[in-house]
From Swiss-Prot:
EC number: 2.1.2.1
Annotated source species: Acholeplasma laidlawii (strain PG-8A)
GO CC terms: cytosol
Pathway annotation from the record: One-carbon metabolism; tetrahydrofolate interconversion; Amino-acid biosynthesis; glycine biosynthesis; glycine from L-serine: step 1/1
GO MF entries: glycine hydroxymethyltransferase activity; pyridoxal phosphate binding
Cofactor or coenzyme needed: pyridoxal 5'-phosphate
GO biological process, one term: glycine biosynthetic process from serine
Binding site for (6S)-5,6,7,8-tetrahydrofolate: 116, 120-122
Site (Plays an important role in substrate specificity): 224
Gene, per the UniProt record: glyA
Protein name (database record): Serine hydroxymethyltransferase
Pfam short name (any one): SHMT
UniProt function note: Catalyzes the reversible interconversion of serine and glycine with tetrahydrofolate (THF) serving as the one-carbon carrier. This reaction serves as the major source of one-carbon groups required for the biosynthesis of purines, thymidylate, methionine, and other important biomolecules. Also exhibits THF-independent aldolase activity toward beta-hydroxyamino acids, producing glycine and aldehydes, via a retro-aldol mechanism.
Length: 409
């Protein structure tokens, strides 16, 4: 029996989401559209199989074929990032990060990560996250002068704090991160260097952002976002002793049975990332972000760090228009443009209001948008934000969005 026949209520909810994805311009930087092959693997009968443990070391019988699946994912991931040891089992990026903490630290140990307001992530030491609850978390930020990481300041804080682990990586930082400098800082204070490359993994895979692997003790990522795979996490290292600790921290430390259907989908995405066309795609992602950035600047908006090196931009809507990020998000959604409000460095607004918005290009680049389309998108966004209480203007923009979306993949 089909889902439609058995559960029409759920089927209709999925169909409505399908329509939303087809009719909205998707600019959330952490989202993307997976291939049909990834979807096929994710919806496969592998969801039926329990496989606690690792290939050739399972706690259940009948795992010979899921072993093949996981080994494929491991081998492809190693090839992409030139890593000696990988773990493809984490259910999410946050669980991958939690496994790193468990593997390398004890509760109460000091960590130094990027402040959430400056572009960091909840798992980098935020007080309401496990990372700030079980560990003594300290933070570095960005310079007030250029809104970029001030590595001298990071060093100064590290010397003062003496963390056991330093975390590099971000969820809202539009510039290249210098992992070599972070390695030097970590070595100065005798700390582990942990890099969370979730947002930039696809760029790193193609050599469009420096790789953290030569410098970090351990690296994590999500498999969605720029990697364009299923929702999930991965962990990579070149250190054999750390790899053993990581494996124990993932299973049985953080998780029980792995999601074999998701691991299969990861394997598909990793094969796609090894295809030469993937670099063409990632190159276009960056070109599109620069087109978006340049257009917003020409329209008089302040951009955090004055631009971008990667797949995202942070736009200050408060300084130009006097509106909050939430105002912007709500108005744009009425026009079928999906974005997220985002705190900016040194933001005076509350986290649920914010002074800015975060825009990313990966999803619509997958749909075939290039520079001209993103220039148009920036203009449409400006039209809405300059008229957030004008329903006539918003409806006009919505019609233009629907017209644009009719021509995409």
């Amino acid at each position: 029996m089909t889902l439609k026949d058995y559960d029409l209520e759920l089927f209709n909810a999925i169909q409505r989401e399908d329509n939303r994805q087809k009719e909205h311009i998707e600019l959330i930087a952490s989202e993307n559209f997976v291939s049909d092959a990834v979807l096929e693997a994710q919806g496969s009968i592998l969801t039926n199989k329990y496989a606690e443990g690792y290939p050739n070391k399972r706690y259940y019988g009948g795992c010979e074929f899921v072993d093949q699946v996981e080994i494929l994912a491991q081998d492809r991931l190693k090839q992409i990032f030139n890593a000696k040891f990988v773990n493809v089992q984490p259910h999410s990026g946050s669980q991958a990060n939690a496994a790193v903490y468990q593997a390398l630290l004890s509760p109460g140990d000091r960590v130094l990560g990027m402040d959430l307001n400056a572009g960091g992530h909840l798992t980098h030491g935020y007080k309401l996250s496990f990372s700030g609850h079980y560990y003594e978390a300290h933070a570095y930020g960005v310079s007030r002068f250029d809104e970029r990481i001030d590595y001298e300041e990071v060093l100064k804080i590290a010397i003062e704090v003496k963390p056991k682990m330093i975390i590099a990586g971000a969820s809202a930082y539009p510039r290249v991160i210098d992992f070599k400098k972070f390695r030097e800082i970590a070595d100065t204070v005798g700390a582990y260097l942990f890099v969370d490359m979730a947002h930039i993994a696809g760029l790193v895979a193609c050599g469009l952002h420096p790789s953290p692997l030569p410098y970090a003790d351990v690296v994590t990522s999500t498999t969605h976002k720029t990697l364009r795979g299923p929702r999930g996490g991965i962990i990579l290292t070149n250190d054999a002793s750390i790899a053993k600790k990581i494996d124990r921290a993932v299973f049985p430390g953080q998780q029980g049975g792995p999601l074999m259907h998701i691991i299969a989908a990861k394997a598909v995405a990793f094969k796609e990332a090894l295809d030469p066309n993937f670099k063409v795609y990632q190159t276009q992602v960056i070109k599109n972000a620069k087109a978006l950035s340049d257009t917003f600047k020409s329209l008089g908006y302040k951009l955090i760090s004055d631009g971008t090196d990667n797949h995202l931009i942070l736009v200050d809507v408060k300084s130009k228009l006097g509106i909050t990020g939430r105002d912007a998000e709500d108005a744009l959604y009425k026009a079928n443009i999906t974005i997220n409000k985002n705190q900016l460095p040194f933001d005076q607004e509350k986290p649920m209001l914010t002074s800015g918005i975060r825009l990313g290009t990966p999803a619509m680049t997958t749909k075939g948008f290039k520079e001209n389309e993103f220039i148009k998108v920036a203009q449409l966004i400006d039209e809405v934000l300059s008229n957030i209480n004008n329903e006539e203007v918003i409806n006009k923009v919505k019609k233009e969005v629907l017209k644009l979306m009719k021509d995409v993949k």
